[in-house]
Amino acid sequence: MRMKRIEATIQHDKTGAVSDAIKDMVGGFTILEGNGRGSGERQTIRGGRGTGTFVAEFNKVATVSTIVDDSKVEAVVNAISDAAYSGKAGDGIIIVSTVDDARNIASKKRGVEAL
């Protein structure tokens, strides 16, 4: 059976909704928080001591990563897309790529069984 890696870079405040949407669909997932710069509007930040405001160089984002067998890809991608959607530029991007093999370190299982 073939496997796919799904990586979704989303707005930081959507991680809870995305987590809730996929937690019962996948064996596990990882969320990495970071900063990103894309098409969305960046936050305006007030300077210290009333010195004015400036536009942040980056937005707070999160990348949700999981590996699933081919049969689950469409459902997981749709769930992430629906949960992360606001209709504004900067909602994020979902990338799906092929995974040749996976190995569970603790159980020594390989392929889809490792998931």
Task: Identify the meaning behind each predicted range.
Residues M1-L115:
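Positively charged, small/polar-rich N-terminal and surface patches that mediate targeting and assembly
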